Amino acid sequence: IVISSTPPRDYVLSFTVTEGHNRTALNQEISELLDTSELSEFQKGDEIQLWIENSEENDADLIASTGFTPYRDLVQLRCPLPVRESKLVTRRFELGVDEESFLRVNSRAFAWHPEQGDLDESTFTELKNEPWFDLEGFLLYELDNQLAGFCWTKIHLDDSPPLGEIYAIAIDPAYHGRGLGMPMTEAGLNYLHAKGIQTGMLYVESDNVPALRTYEKIGFTHFLTNRAFRYRV
């Protein structure tokens, strides 16, 4: 079980049960984590978050006695590559040029999102220093000399065979309704295929119906679900 160094907005603590973790003693482990987290330091009404990766149907019942209740599902979808050719002409992200416009569009598009919506200059700088960060795979699409959308990809070389992820994708709300979401996704997926990747992957909220419909049309299918639970002090 991994404790987050920086819990997301609205939570004082967040920890994750990683994929493949033995469920046998999970209830006891969570209870012990709560006991050692010095809950007395938190105020009444504060909330703690728990993620279970690749969640199973009975996980909610399994940990019910700990006081955690499910509230959010993040589904992982996968699709074979390549996909249909994108109609958009994109360009790569340019360091020292595109940071401000990217962060502005990201903030507008993900204002509702508890993790991606909090991305700021400092956090973005940390991500740019990650070994997987690839400027060529960070695609931007512009309209009227303005950033209209982006598709940020990530290649998981530790997977066998390597897996290509749409790490983050967004269209500026000012350009919604123009049918840009699907071709933006296709552009990212086909970049990954050009790098030799045979399977594309992304995560999406289970209640984001428009996005799910778009991804289904592209060829994505459900692979697993990460489920979030919360506990109120």
Region roles according to the model:
Residues 8-27, 162-173:
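Conserved acetyl-CoA binding element of GNAT-fold acetyltransferases
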Residues 22-39, 168-171, 177-194, 212-217:
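Conserved acetyl-CoA-binding loop-helix of GNAT-fold acetyltransferases
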Residues 7, 17-89, 229-231:
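Acyl-donor-binding surface of acyltransferase catalytic domains
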Residues 89-104:
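A short beta-loop-alpha structural element at the N-terminal edge
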Residues 64-85, 186, 194-233:
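Active-site/acyl-donor-binding loops of N-acyltransferases
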Residues 1-8, 115-169:
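A conserved beta-strand-loop-helix scaffold within acyl/acetyltransferase catalytic domains
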Residues 43-45, 136, 197:
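Short, high-confidence coil segments that cap the C-terminus of an alpha-helix
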Residues 48-52, 166, 200-204:
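Conserved hydrophobic beta-strand within the GNAT/NAT acetyltransferase core sheet
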